[in-house]
């Protein structure tokens, strides 16, 4: 490996480790590209996150899941492997702990590692047939009501067939990776990362029969808002947002390029799941 990216959360501890890691890599004749996380963007149409250099061998993420999602957004549609190092409180996306980083990196530099692909979603927003933005997400696309105590009526179609109108505080469309994020908090199911599916989870639905729904990842999901919509926002992985109105149409489908995650030997997805959700014997 000749060139590695370091993507760090803007916080004292991750930044200190980024400095140490950069020196460690440079001493091994490896070029380093540094990038730091930035606050969420309120209007995605006015932002340009830039892209990681195409010749990066991998990207090391120092931070929590939010930082990992920012790094995935920076990498974009490039097949650059990501290694997450846990600094946050949950860390579903982090593959190793900070105290284990250097032994893991020794293996990575020797190319002694495996990877796992994670499905992403491609979301296209149109306003009166004009494309406003196209975004790719690793976790989820979320329609969310604002501060006013009003329901968002989300007309939902699957493969051009009308499904229902969700009367709820919002609607989450998540990947299997995103099923352990906002969707889980809203009562959605947990999907193993390799399951070929997309999850639709309503947020606090007014109708009790509006339950989470799992569809195949070959499906195309289309959503519009009722004309009475007020103060409704669309967010992409919690990193960028866009104000919605009844003239917008949101189309979501599986993205052509997945995210590639570096895997640490001896650690399974269910090991991580049990630990994070305290299923390993402790009280929840």
From Swiss-Prot:
One of its GO terms (molecular function) is NAD binding. This is NAD kinase. GO terms for cellular component: cytoplasm. HAMAP family: NAD_kinase. NAD(+) binds at residues 65-66, 139-140, 150, 167, 169, 239. Belongs to the NAD kinase family. The active site is at residue 65. It holds the Pfam family NAD_kinase_C. Keywords: ATP-binding, Cytoplasm, Kinase, NAD, NADP, Nucleotide-binding, Transferase. Its cofactor is a divalent metal cation. The keyword Electron transport does not apply. The keyword Repressor does not apply.
């Amino acid at each position: 490996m000749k060139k590695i990216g370091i993507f760090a959360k803007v916080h004292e501890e991750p930044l200190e480790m980024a400095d140490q890691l950069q020196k460690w890599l440079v001493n091994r004749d490896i070029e380093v590209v540094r990038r730091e996380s930035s606050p969420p963007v309120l209007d995605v149409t006015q932002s340009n996150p830039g892209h990681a250099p195409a010749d990066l061998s991998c990207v090391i993420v120092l931070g929590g899941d939010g930082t990992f999602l920012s790094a995935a957004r920076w990498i974009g549609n490039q097949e650059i492997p990501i290694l997450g190092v846990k600094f946050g409180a949950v860390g579903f996306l982090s593959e190793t702990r900070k105290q284990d980083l250097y032994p893991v990196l020794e293996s990575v530099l020797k190319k002694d590692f495996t990877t796992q692909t994670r499905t992403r979603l491609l979301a296209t927003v149109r306003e009166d047939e004009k494309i406003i933005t196209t975004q790719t997400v690793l976790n989820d696309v979320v329609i969310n009501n604002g501060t006013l105590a009003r329901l968002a009526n989300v007309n939902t179609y699957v493969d051009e067939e009308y499904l229902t109108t969700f009367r709820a505080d919002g609607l989450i469309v998540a990947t299997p990776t995103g099923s352990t994020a906002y969707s889980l908090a809203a009562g959605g199911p947990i999907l193993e990362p390799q399951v070929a599916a997309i999850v639709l989870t309503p947020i606090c639905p007014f109708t009790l029969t509006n339950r989470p729904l799992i569809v195949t990842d070959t499906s195309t999901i289309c959503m519009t808002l009722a004309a009475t919509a007020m103060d409704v926002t669309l967010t992409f992985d919690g990193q960028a947002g866009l104000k919605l109105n009844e003239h917008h149409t949101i189309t979501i489908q599986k993205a052509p390029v997945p995210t590639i995650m570096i895997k640490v030997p001896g650690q399974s997805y269910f090991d991580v799941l049990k630990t994070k959700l305290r299923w390993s014997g402790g009280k929840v």
